[in-house]
Amino acid sequence: MLYAFKLGRKLRGEEPWCPEKGGKGGSSDKSAKYAAEAQKYAADLQNQQFNTIMNNLKPFTPLADKYVGSLENLSSLEGQGQALNQYYNSQQYKDLAGQARYQSLAAAEATGGLGSTATSNQLATIAPTLGQQWLSGQMNNYQNLANIGLGALQGQANAGQTYANNMSQISQQSAALAAANANRPSAMQSAIGGGASGAIAGAGLAKLIGSSTPWGAAIGGGLGLLGSLF
């Protein structure tokens, strides 16, 4: 009875004879549409995350090139000599060296050692000691800054690899969905298949009731066709 009402609506033009591709009211098309939208959302999210990571790390990446070069310069005797020469002419060295000399002379005066060889040797070590301490500190600072830059570059590389892997999976899923949509039968193909199945079932019914007429097959085919359309 339900099919009769639906058939009437189709005959009157109130409903299309063939619903959207996929049959059954286009539910398959809707599922495919939702799946495509989900994949687009996933791709957009991947783009957003990738761009965010790259932009956040971008300010730190130049540190790698700058301070790796500084470390390379300090690893040579010429570079160390130039750096120490600049340090010895700085106000920082003058202040520290003056303070060290004052402490050494005050201690020597308190013990009566002014003018002694020990005091002279102690004063002579002030410059190289301060220079080596400063140079070691500079190398540590450069190393830390270079590591920040290298870490940022590694973070960008990891983000790029993750992005490539995820987008590859999304592309494969999109290709699989497109292939499934291309291979899905249309409403007319489903109707023909339903009619054929119904005809076979109807023929079997006619045989059971002992009828040699084709009406059983015809009725079964019609029911199968209607079922596929609705």
UniProtKB/Swiss-Prot annotation:
Any single GO BP term: symbiont entry into host cell
Record keywords, A-Z: Viral genome ejection through host cell envelope, Viral penetration into host cytoplasm, Virus entry into host cell
Family: Belongs to the podoviruses gp7 family.
Record's function text: Component of the phage injection machinery. Required for injection of the phage DNA into the host.
Name of this chain's protein: DNA transfer protein gp7
